[in-house]
């Protein structure tokens, strides 16, 4: 394949996919933009531009990965979340738009954005939640925890790339390596998919780290640890926010109640699915 235009390349590439929908076209456009180092506006006004052999080879290599089912974020090496460009690797879960619901909920609950809050993000991965909150709450201090050093390395790189300095990174299994300081807010997007769940997209199963996705006890094992120990790390009147699957809200509400949390509320995502449950330690 040589001396073809961007428009021709798009048409030929789309024809290789069984499902030629808007999403596939978007992914192909993003791959071409990434290789060319341009944005989609450039692409639209230069559809007749011819591509040289070396450029075509680079694009074709990435398209083959897309055909194999590899998620676009891993092919590009990044994903945008809360207006931040986040690097991703095979060691990290790909940030989802649904998780922005959790960030928005936390921010909506904070009346004074200039307050000096202490925030804990458990299972930070790419740092998506921690960095979004740190960027919006410049006077607050965020502690981002992950069990895996490879994930923390990615999160640190993302903090540096986005010029965010009010985040401290700690390698820990949930609360294990934390000191006795308490937090005003705890937030987590932990593994919550049931080990027996068969409704997972094949690309997710094949490419994303299982350790960040699946949990025992109907997907509740890690959530149970986070909630049951939260009172030792949360200030009185502080809030905890847990992202979860859309069928788990009732079980998580029960866990919060058993641990004497109050003001328990379920938050829906943009698809109107239960996505996050929040609770307060102390007052109603």
Swiss-Prot record:
Catalytic activity, reaction form: L-glutaminyl-[peptide chain release factor] + S-adenosyl-L-methionine = N(5)-methyl-L-glutaminyl-[peptide chain release factor] + S-adenosyl-L-homocysteine + H(+)
Origin organism lineage: Bacteria, Pseudomonadati, Pseudomonadota, Gammaproteobacteria, Thiotrichales
Residues that hold S-adenosyl-L-methionine according to the record: 123-127, 146, 174, 189
GO molecular function per UniProt: nucleic acid binding; protein-(glutamine-N5) methyltransferase activity; protein-glutamine N-methyltransferase activity
EC number: 2.1.1.297
Organism: Francisella tularensis subsp. tularensis (strain SCHU S4 / Schu 4)
SUPFAM superfamilies hit by this protein: S-adenosyl-L-methionine-dependent methyltransferases
Gene Ontology BP terms: methylation
The keyword Transferase is annotated on this UniProt entry: yes
Pfam families reported for this sequence: MTS (PF05175), PrmC_N (PF17827)
Stated family: Belongs to the protein N5-glutamine methyltransferase family. PrmC subfamily.
Function: Methylates the class 1 translation termination release factors RF1/PrfA and RF2/PrfB on the glutamine residue of the universally conserved GGQ motif.
Keywords on record: Methyltransferase, S-adenosyl-L-methionine, Transferase
Alphabetical list of InterPro entries matching this protein: DNA_methylase_N6_adenine_CS (IPR002052), HemK-like (IPR004556), N5-glutamine_MTase (IPR050320), PrmC_N (IPR040758), RF_methyltr_PrmC (IPR019874), SAM-dependent_MTases_sf (IPR029063), Small_mtfrase_dom (IPR007848)
Enzyme class: transferase
Entry protein name: Release factor glutamine methyltransferase
Residues that hold substrate according to the record: 189-192
């Amino acid at each position: 394949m040589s001396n073809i235009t961007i428009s021709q390349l798009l048409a030929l590439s789309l024809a290789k996919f069984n499902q030629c929908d808007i999403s596939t076209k978007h992914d192909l456009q993003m791959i071409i933009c990434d290789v060319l180092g341009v944005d989609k506006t450039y692409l639209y006004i230069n559809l007749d531009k011819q591509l040289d052999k070396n450029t075509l080879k680079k694009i074709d290599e990435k398209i083959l990965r897309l055909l194999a089912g590899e998620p676009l974020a891993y092919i590009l090496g990044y994903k945008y979340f809360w207006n931040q460009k986040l690097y991703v690797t095979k060691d990290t879960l790909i940030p989802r738009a649904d998780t922005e619901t959790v960030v928005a909920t936390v921010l909506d609950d904070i009346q004074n954005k200039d307050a000096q809050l202490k925030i804990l993000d458990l299972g930070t991965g790419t740092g998506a939640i921690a960095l979004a909150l740190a960027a919006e709450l410049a006077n607050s201090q965020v502690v981002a925890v992950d069990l895996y050093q490879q994930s923390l390395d990615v999160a640190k790189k993302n903090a540096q790339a986005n010029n965010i300095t009010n985040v401290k990174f700690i390698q820990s299994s949930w609360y294990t390596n934390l000191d006795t300081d308490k937090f005003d807010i705890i937030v987590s997007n932990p593994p919550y998919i049931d080990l027996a769940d068969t409704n997972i997209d094949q690309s997710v199963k094949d490419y994303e780290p299982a350790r960040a996705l699946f949990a025992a006890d109907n997907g509740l094992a890690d959530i149970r640890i986070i909630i049951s120990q939260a009172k030792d790390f949360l200030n009185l009147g502080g809030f905890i926010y847990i992202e979860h699957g859309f069928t788990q809200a009732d079980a998580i509400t029960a866990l919060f109640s058993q641990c004497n949390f109050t003001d328990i509320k379920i938050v829906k995502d943009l698809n109107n699915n239960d996505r996050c449950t929040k609770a307060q330690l102390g007052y109603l």
